[in-house]
Amino acid sequence: MALQGLYQCFSHWGKNGGTFIIGDTHFGEEDLKKAFPNRPNDDELVKIINQKVGKCGTLILLGDVGDLEYAKKLKGYKILVCGNHDKGHTAYREIFDEVYEGPVLISSRILLSHEPVPHAEWVMNIHAHVHDAKVKIDKYHFNTCADRINYTPINFNQWLKEGHLSHLISTRKRVIDGATERKRKRGGKKIGEK
């Protein structure tokens, strides 16, 4: 099912299946197993992701892929938003269908990035990078780090249906209502207009 409201250049995402998001797979990086003892091994993580995404789904990986031999095993249409560990973009372009080197604004309300973008109250920033469960950011950020989402990609379509953007609508309404009220107090004149 295609996602509604995406900018035209991203409208093909999820056309043939669901859209799923995860970050920080860190394939082949054994030190994470020490920090997160419940972390599945790399083959198991690939299996978990593939069971969700399937052959026809879209997988958005929000950086820090790790060993590309495991990334090659991932199914579906693969999109990478590069993370701080992702070096050598040419190799990624051979494996991923789309590669973005920095944050990507995919709609008027959704920003995808590896690291959380600070002061982004105008959008929902879906990111990864933050492994520590004790670190809380704010209601304008959603963390898809594999270690924070039980190593299972979120179903983006379902996430949207659950109303995760509803507070953005009220924030925008509050800003617009405030601007309208200030303009009314100026007698309908623009700022600086006499």
List each model region and its residues.
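A general structural motif
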Residues: 16, 56, 75-77, 121-122
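Intrinsically disordered, low-complexity, compositionally biased regions/tails
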Residues: 32, 106, 167, 182, ...
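N-terminal active-site segment of His-dependent metallophosphoesterases
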Residues: 1-70, 162, 173-177
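Active-site neighborhood of divalent metal-dependent phosphoester bond hydrolases
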Residues: 34-39, 48, 68-116, 120
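General alpha-helical segment detector with a strong preference for membrane-spanning helices
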Residues: 28, 68, 87, 133-135
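Conserved beta-sheet core of the metallophosphoesterase superfamily
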Residues: 90-177
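Short Lys/Arg-rich cationic patches that frequently serve as NLS/NoLS or arginine-rich RNA/DNA-binding motifs
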Residues: 2-7, 181-194
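Active-site neighborhood of phospho(di)ester-bond hydrolases with catalytic His/Asp-centered motifs
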Residues: 21-23, 59-64, 79-84, 112-113, ...
